[in-house]
Amino acid sequence: MLSGLIQRFEEEKMKHNQDRVEELSLVRVDDTISQPPRYAPSAPMPSSMPTVALEILDKAMSNTTGATQTQKAEKAAFASYAEAFRDDVRLRQIKRHVNEQILPKLKSDLSELKKKRAIIHTTLLVAAVVALLTSVCTLSSDMSVAFKINGTKTEVPSWFKSLNPMLGVVNLGATFLMMVCAKSERALNQQIDMIKKEVMKKQSYNDAVRMSFTEFSSIPLDGFEMPLT
């Protein structure tokens, strides 16, 4: 038992001496243990473009849902700017060249659709006038309405009443044409709105690519260090 106590005392003494040696091995300066030198961070800073893109998207989403075409175009422009800030420099240049090639075609299609819509709208107005006139003529002859001309009553002649079947057919055709024109015009309006939105998106994207970083801040933003022409 005594030998065990002696062995235990020796082990604790050796452990204490080892801890003391490790403590003394540290260099003390002004009674404080010196710390390893601090180095400035050399890792590349994270890109600021995704943050800017998120802020632009937050601006677009914080507004109320676009009820008019102008508000929808505004949101499309915000989305395009955010996309331009999020994309890589090479991808931005590729998209820009593709947009420049496709924009003239989109504008040409938009002009053709507007001309077609104008023709259909004019046809719709003519059909509406024809339908209104034939309806009035048919109703007048059916009710045997008498018209006063120079103080004398003049009834609808019998030969005019015989035209009622033909006027009814014309009225039916004009009404059907009105329905077709209205449906076609509604479809054209949707196509025109869609193309306008695409034109706005592509133009806004190209404007964002051409934009100089000095318009935002004095700190260069990645991807805009060199002016893009």
Curated annotation (Swiss-Prot):
Residues 185-198 are annotated as: CCM-II. It is found in: Host cell membrane; Host Golgi apparatus. Signal peptide: none annotated. Disulfide bonds: none annotated. Residues 14-26 are annotated as: CCM-I. Residues 94-116 are annotated as: CCM-III. One of its GO terms (biological process) is symbiont-mediated suppression of host innate immune response. It is a multi-pass membrane protein. It comes from the Viruses. The chain crosses the membrane at residues 119-139, 162-182. Pfam families: Orbi_NS3. Keywords: Host cell membrane, Host Golgi apparatus, Host membrane, Host-virus interaction, Inhibition of host innate immune response by virus, Membrane, Transmembrane, Transmembrane helix, Viral immunoevasion. One of its GO terms (cellular component) is host cell plasma membrane. Forms homooligomers via coiled-coil motif. Interacts with host OPTN; this interaction inhibits innate immune response. Belongs to the orbivirus NS3 family. Plays a role in the inhibition of host innate immune response. Interacts with host OPTN and thus inhibits the recruitment of TBK1 to the host Golgi apparatus. In turn, downstream partner IRF3 cannot be activated and IFN-beta production is impaired. Facilitates viral particle release either by increasing plasma membrane permeability through a viroporin-like activity or by viral budding. This is Non-structural protein P8. The gene is Segment-10.
